[in-house]
A protein has these predicted regions:
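Structural motif
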Residues: 33-36, 76, 127, 153-156
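Adenylate-forming
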Residues: 3-7, 89, 112-116, 130-169
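Conserved AMP-binding/adenylation subdomain of ANL enzymes
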Residues: 65-83, 93-133, 148
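Active-site beta-alpha turn of Rossmann-fold NAD(P)-dependent dehydrogenases/reductases
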Residues: 45-48, 88
Length: 169
């Protein structure tokens, strides 16, 4: 959970575990880039399965990037320097959508944990503290806040917030 010291991990053969302070001390890291064609395979994502069995769909690098840039810059009006937050896990397709905000020269804010840990409106506190301009969340989270009668506007200054995106049901 946020703010809690990481647990002592058992040593697992072949797995190295580092904390953030250790990573920040690494002096040099050589990254080797490889050039691929526009139509090169990027990722396989699965359909939700709401209309039958889930289907695997191969997405291509260039097409995904162009589609995401269109959605981010035209539909969501994200500009360079904006701060973007989308509550997601790396196993959900929204993770891929979140990462590509970097191509619009926006910063992304990541959160790992239970969104109501010790505070029902924790994610909106993050939005206020980090001056988030695009805030992405699930419909279930919004519904839960409504059921608990949480009044976000009276608690947090969200003057930088331009758009709230919601997914799911």
């Amino acid at each position: 959970y946020p703010g809690k010291k990481y647990l002592k991990y058992k040593k697992i053969k072949g797995i190295s575990i580092f904390n953030l302070s250790q990573i920040s001390k690494i002096q040099k890291c050589e990254i080797k880039f490889k050039k691929f064609d526009f139509d090169h395979e990027l990722v396989i994502l699965y359909s939700s399965g709401t209309t039958g069995k889930p289907k695997c769909i191969c997405h291509r690098a260039g097409g995904v990037l162009l589609q995401h840039l269109k959605e981010h810059q035209l539909h969501c009006e994200v500009k360079p320097g904006d701060n973007v937050f989308y509550f997601t896990t790396c196993g959900w397709m929204m993770w891929n959508w979140l990462l590509t905000f970097l191509a619009s020269k926006a910063s992304i804010v990541l959160f790992d944990g239970f969104p109501m840990y010790k505070k029902n409106d924790l994610l909106f506190k993050i939005a206020a503290d980090e001056k988030i301009s695009l805030f992405g969340i699930s419909a279930k989270y919004i519904d839960q806040l409504r059921k608990l009668n949480v009044k976000i506007k009276s608690i947090y200054k969200l003057s930088k917030l331009k758009i709230i995106c919601s997914t799911g049901s």
